[in-house]
């Protein structure tokens, strides 16, 4: 941040100084005790919906910038988010605090400026290029790649078929794994295509995946190719004629701090809530969409306190944006022992469907490790992002049981709106919170045919304001219920699936193992929810009733576990779990 210029005060200002010397009145302190208000009461101070149009504008701002931790576009993006939050009242007083946390004081930063890949021989042909930060093919230059001094003209060879020294190599495998080998061999240019075994399906022959290499000044220029470009180069090599390429790349490599933002609505003694979204990576959906919703949620509650007269919440609300994983690790560390639940927003704006597609986009909440990793019951299948498999109880028992994922599915719209949870896979900002013992869940959309490619740019088929609004509405309902109300909205959402799920679990084969595992898990998850709800569990009849429903389902599963264990196995099970 830049400092304001020093301005010489006028005599008038000097004369008024004694009148202004007193500090402004302090805001009231957060409540020392929990104030239980009925469901819906927060509507007096807060809108139900985020400003989705404004959120979409932020997606557009971020989309035009290739955001790598600490580089100039990243800093501009962080400045923009900070400006929006300050405009909503954060940083003005102790009720709404705003700070930057430094993750690394002197980190190397990297920014792509321009690149081009041309065929010189046998005939001149431009294959891929970009000359501005918001050009479509900006992902062709692998993150971390060095640039060139002017342009290089080099012979093209296939990996493993000729000496790579001083040449452009059409490489095998993934850049993260193979770049170092090619650098050691003296290649001048390393060309990598899409690898469907690792990156999944790419929807368009012109899509250029993005990736990264651990490069230094000594390594070859590293480029990603679309399938169309890779096919063209292979066809040229197949003719047997020499193929000469012209390659140019311009990058900005600097050193500087890597920072993140932490905005807090300061509240009372109950366990806090975190909304996290990573700011880095160049995509509109991944993850300008998550940052936009997180910022819009912070603005909604900030304005309600500053302008709407809302009291401090019963618990603190934290909104954090920064580099993926690293900013979540920092938050989990700094707030250790004060946070009850964390939500990661990562790829939340893509419209679901189309159902005619062989791999339609789904609206998903990823669960923490739990028995769904072995017995899904009525929980959805894996996302397809990472191959899942059975896990035993030793795997999921390390995670604190929590009903957070069920709460989010219900408040986001449930099955009626196409929302479902799926077993744990990992790979996003919920993982550091789980590692710190904080129940957390990932809200996201997948499969995504633009994922990690040049196609992930703002447009109605990639990021929809309606989708941003829906995610914002569900998250806001949870934050309002737990922050200002009796938690009944959250408790009812947690209980909603278990009336039927308990029966589904009891009917599974082998029923004893499933019922025992889910029964133990649900009982512990109910205890964890009771801790989150605090005084509302006894002060609010609606909250207490919903919690009793959950405990009733746990009891039914426990009974089924006992019957199946001491009975005759199959003959002793009752499919209804009654």
Q: Which stretches of residues belong to each language-model region?
A:
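Bacterial signal peptide processing site
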Residues: 23-25
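Noncatalytic luminal/extracellular "stalk/propeptide" segments of secretory-pathway proteins
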Residues: 32, 36, 41, 48, ...
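Metal-dependent peptidase/peptidase-like ectodomains
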Residues: 50, 147, 268-270, 322-442, ...
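Extracellular/luminal Protease-associated
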Residues: 60, 72, 129-224, 286, ...
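Soluble metallo-hydrolase cores and metallopeptidase-like ectodomains found primarily
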Residues: 135-158, 210-286, 296-308
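Short helix-loop-beta-strand segments that form the rim/entrance of peptidase-like active sites
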Residues: 300-330, 338
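His/Asp/Glu-rich mid-to-C-terminal helical/loop segments that flank catalytic regions of hydrolases
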Residues: 449-501
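Acidic, Ser/Thr-rich low-complexity intrinsically disordered segments
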Residues: 488-567
């Amino acid at each position: 941040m830049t400092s304001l210029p020093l301005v010489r005060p006028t005599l008038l200002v000097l004369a008024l100084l004694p009148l202004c010397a007193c500090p402004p009145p302090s805001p009231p302190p957060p409540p020392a005790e929990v104030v239980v208000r009925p469901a819906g009461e927060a509507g007096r101070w807060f809108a139900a919906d985020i400003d989705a149009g404004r959120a979409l504008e932020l997606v557009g701002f971020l989309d035009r910038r290739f955001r790598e931790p600490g580089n100039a576009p990243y800093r501009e993006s962080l400045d923009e988010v900070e400006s929006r939050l300050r405009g909503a009242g954060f940083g003005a007083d102790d009720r709404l605090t705003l700070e930057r946390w430094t993750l690394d004081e002197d980190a190397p930063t990297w920014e792509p400026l321009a690149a081009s890949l041309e065929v010189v021989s046998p005939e001149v042909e431009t294959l891929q290029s970009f000359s501005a930060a918001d050009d479509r093919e900006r992902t062709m230059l692998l993150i971390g790649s060095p640039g060139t001094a002017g342009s290089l003209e080099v012979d093209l060879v296939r990996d493993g078929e000729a000496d790579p020294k001083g040449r452009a190599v059409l490489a095998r495998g993934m850049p993260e794994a193979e770049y170092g080998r090619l650098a050691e061999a003296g290649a001048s240019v390393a060309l990598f295509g899409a690898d469907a075994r690792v990156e999944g399906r790419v929807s368009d022959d012109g899509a250029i995946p993005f990736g990264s290499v651990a490069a230094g000044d000594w390594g070859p220029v590293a480029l990603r190719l679309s399938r169309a470009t890779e096919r063209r180069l292979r066809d040229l090599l197949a003719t047997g004629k020499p193929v000469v390429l012209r390659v140019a790349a311009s990058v900005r490599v600097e050193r500087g701090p890597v920072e993140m933002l932490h905005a807090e609505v300061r509240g009372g003694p109950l366990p806090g809530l975190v909304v996290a979204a990573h700011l880095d990576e160049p995509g509109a959906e991944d993850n300008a969409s998550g940052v936009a919703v997180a910022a819009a949620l912070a603005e909604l509650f900030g304005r309600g306190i500053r302008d709407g007269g809302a009291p401090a919440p019963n618990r603190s609300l934290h909104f954090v944006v920064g580099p993926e994983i690293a900013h979540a690790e920092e938050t989990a560390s700094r707030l250790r022992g004060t946070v009850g639940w964390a939500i990661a927003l990562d790829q939340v704006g893509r419209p679901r469907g189309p159902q005619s597609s062989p791999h339609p986009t789904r609206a998903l909440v990823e669960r923490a490790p739990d028995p769904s990793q072995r017995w899904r019951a009525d929980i959805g299948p894996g996302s397809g992002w990472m191959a899942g498999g059975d896990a035993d109880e030793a795997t999921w028992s390390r995670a604190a049981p929590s009903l957070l994922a069920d709460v989010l599915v219900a408040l986001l719209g449930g099955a009626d709106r196409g929302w479902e949870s799926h077993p744990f896979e990992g790979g996003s900002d919920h993982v550091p919170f789980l590692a710190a013992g904080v129940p957390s869940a990932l809200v996201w959309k997948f499969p995504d045919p633009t994922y990690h490619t040049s196609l992930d740019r703002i447009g109605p088929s990639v990021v929809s304001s309606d989708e941003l609004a829906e995610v914002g509405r569900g998250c806001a309902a949870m934050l309002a219920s737990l922050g200002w109300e009796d938690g009944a909205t959250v408790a009812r959402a947690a209980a909603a699936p278990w009336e039927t799920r308990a029966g589904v679990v009891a009917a599974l084969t082998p029923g004893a193992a499933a019922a025992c595992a889910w029964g133990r898990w649900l009982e512990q998850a109910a205890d964890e929810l009771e801790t989150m709800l605090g005084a509302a569990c006894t002060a609010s009849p609606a909250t207490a009733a919903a919690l009793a429903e959950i405990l009733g389902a746990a009891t039914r599963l426990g009974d089924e576990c006992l019957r199946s264990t001491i009975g005759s196995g199959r003959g002793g099970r009752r499919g209804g779990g009654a």
